Curated annotation (Swiss-Prot):
GO terms for cellular component: cytoplasm. GO terms for biological process: L-histidine biosynthetic process. GO terms for molecular function: magnesium ion binding; phosphoribosyl-AMP cyclohydrolase activity; zinc ion binding. This is Phosphoribosyl-AMP cyclohydrolase.
Length: 141
């Protein structure tokens, strides 16, 4: 039995209605974009299964589904950098989420010790494609 209501066949109800009916993909996951609630910086992109989303809503602490480890993941549980959810939004067809969070502890979100997982810029110049690394890694991982 699902914690969330089934999506109706009426597209308008999904796109304009007030009922939260997240649409999980064939693997049972929904994409979650995570930004810092203070300044809007993009911190990470992750995935949630139904249990992770339910726990996030119940506790106010972000939980995700680790595809690589195949298990539930309470972000920051080991490092102390827990993500407190300030606001949660869904997109027009309810198949993606946007979490605005406050990060506890000393602040890094990425397992590399950086604040954001998006620290590399893809640079295309003169037919060459490379990565430009922004910001040093301040923490051991």
């Amino acid at each position: 039995m699902s914690f969330f209501p089934a999506q109706p066949s009426d597209k308008k109800a999904i796109e304009e209605g007030a009922a939260f009916m997240p649409r999980f993909d064939a693997s049972g996951l929904i994409t979650a974009v995570v930004t810092d609630a203070r300044d809007g910086e993009l911190l990470m992109v992750a995935h949630m299964n139904e249990e992770a989303l339910r726990l996030t809503l119940e506790t106010g602490i972000a939980h995700y589904w680790s595809r690589s480890r195949g298990k539930l993941w309470k972000k920051g549980e080991t490092s102390g950098n827990l993500q407190s959810v300030v606001e949660l939004r869904t997109d027009c067809d309810q198949d993606a989420l946007w979490l605005k969070v406050r990060v506890a502890g000393d602040g890094p979100t990425c397992h590399t010790g950086r604040r954001s997982c998006f620290y590399r810029q893809v640079v295309a110049e003169n037919g060459d494609i490379s990565l430009a690394i922004e910001g040093a890694c301040d923490h051991e991982h």
